[in-house]
From Swiss-Prot:
The gene is rpsQ. InterPro entries: NA-bd_OB-fold, Ribosomal_uS17, Ribosomal_uS17_bact/chlr. GO terms for biological process: translation. This is Small ribosomal subunit protein uS17. The keyword Hydrolase does not apply. The lineage of its organism: Bacteria, Pseudomonadati, Pseudomonadota, Alphaproteobacteria, Hyphomicrobiales.
Amino acid sequence: MPKRVLQGVVVSDKQDKTIVVKVERRFTHPVMKKTVRRSKNYHAHDENNAAKVGQTVFIEESRPFSKLKTWRLVEGEARDVAATEA
């Protein structure tokens, strides 16, 4: 079974070897037929402390690293949001 991969924005990199990634999903409300946005924060393992706040990153499922960390950063996938908007 393939591992799930999610794309999100780093909201915190203050912990050692850990980042917090905000992943946003969209769905159509079943009654109102309106597109609704929901977000969730995931703790992910960042072995080299490479990701910085504001970067768009990909994370994938992995073995549990701790109580909260069951995702890891996909290496070489971080890109700065500010650089892409300019």
